Amino acid sequence: MEMAKEQELILVLDFGSQYNQLITRRIREMGVYSELHDHEISIEEIKKMNPKGIILSGGPNSVYEEGSFTIDPEIYNLGIPVLGICYGMQLTTKLLGGKVERANEREYGKAIINAKSDELFAGLPAEQTVWMSHSDKVIEIPEGFEVIADSPSTDYAAIEDKKRRIYGVQFHPEVRHTEYGNDLLNNFVRRVCECKGQWTMENFIEIEIEKIRQRVGDRRVLCAMSGGVDSSVVAVLLHKAIGDQLTCIFVDHGLLRKGEGDMVMEQFGEGFNMNIIRVNAKDRFMNKLKGVSDPEQKRKIIGNEFVYVFDDEASKLKGVDFLAQGTLYTDVIESGTKTAQTIKSHHNVGGLPEDMEFELIEPINTLFKDEVRKLGIELGIPEHLVWRQPFPGPGLGIRVLGEITEDKLEIVRESDAILRQVIREEGLEREIWQYFTVLPNIQSVGVMGDYRTYDHTVGIRAVTSIDGMTSDFARIDWEVLQKISSRIVNEVDHVNRVVYDITSKPPSTIEWE
């Protein structure tokens, strides 16, 4: 992303750590903008971005293995502060003349370090708990470096070259398990990199609007509205930037939540005076999905059909060159990068046909979910809309496990409406990050009245999270769960059992498909 000259930037280089997004997350919480980029970024690109500091993430590789990820060593000569985390510290050590070798045993979990008071640990206690996750270790530091922290298992828990402002830590300050991790990162960002911390949603809007206007010019944009928070925020942001040059296409694919379609038209079409075309494509989607049970195939079909519908609608309009989507930072990482395997394709970043005739605009693809909500409030979207439950582009299509039918959709739609109503009545909307029902491809025996039943099972998924990268199941009061279960079984046809998902992410994803 091309940033305005006055925008402070901390550049994070990706070496494949499962925590790399958390690094950018933590820095943004300090009011400093941060982006994650591939480790192969060129020196010229870095100079153009003009970052105040560079962080090298952790990663699963060993620095001494053939083909392991590396960087241009010239990065250390740019005069820009550098912080290497875990693999990033080991790589720094190797590239600057130190030595790294495989440890006798992998160190994973909490550890106690003893830190010296310096720039990185300024104001922090000497003894502190950190989170280790590595199988290699530094055995000799480069010339010019000093040890600033050690632990029972390593003499080099943290190192520094104060003159060149190059630092390394063997642990992960970005994870919550590291006791003073945020403080350490804050010291690097504020004390070492001298960032003031002035990044806000207000200046994000200013920068993004200017970028949109420069790119679009006098041309027209189609915005893909799904009914979810992300696409709604994108639509309002674009409308603020280019006004009537924006046409929103709201595809009613028959996979929406109860009352979703009418709500979108009322709140955004009328409320924001936006040009929204509602397309009834239910039969088209259901025909394509008939007999399909594989979740990846369903996602691809829904993603493709979305774009084909837009293509059909765009052919009725003149001069439309762009398609806007509500892709998030987490969407991109979960679909895999050069350093991370694909967990599952996302509807906004996978499934797009090669012959698509639009250029993509994804104005919030560097934001996390909670940042999108803050952006929505700043744009003037009412709180009750901004805090609506996250809803994936494929809609209920990925909350019906296996083949999708009208009857199954109705079960999910009605049970989900009950869940949302009870959560709202109990005042739990802000306490639970995401909650919804799913319909597993499971039937079981039950007794209702005096009769034996053999009907469907509904699953409830409710999680707590900050940004969607990790989550834990919500500890909902048993009486509330019983109320939800009782209402679903009694009010939704063909359901005789309700179960509650108590797995975290990882190992599970939030959505079931």
From Swiss-Prot:
Role of this protein: Catalyzes the synthesis of GMP from XMP.
Lineage of origin: Bacteria, Bacillati, Bacillota, Bacilli, Bacillales
Keyword Membrane among UniProt keywords: no
Residues of the Glutamine amidotransferase type-1 domain: 9-198
GO-annotated cellular components: cytosol
Entries under Gene3D superfamilies matching the protein: 3.30.300.10, 3.40.50.880, HUPs (3.40.50.620)
Protein name: GMP synthase [glutamine-hydrolyzing]
Pfam families: GATase, GMP_synt_C, tRNA_Me_trans
Organism: Staphylococcus aureus (strain MSSA476)
GO molecular-function terms, A-Z: ATP binding; GMP synthase activity
Keyword ATP-binding annotated: yes
Residue ranges constituting the GMPS ATP-PPase domain according to the UniProt record: 199-388
EC code: 6.3.5.2
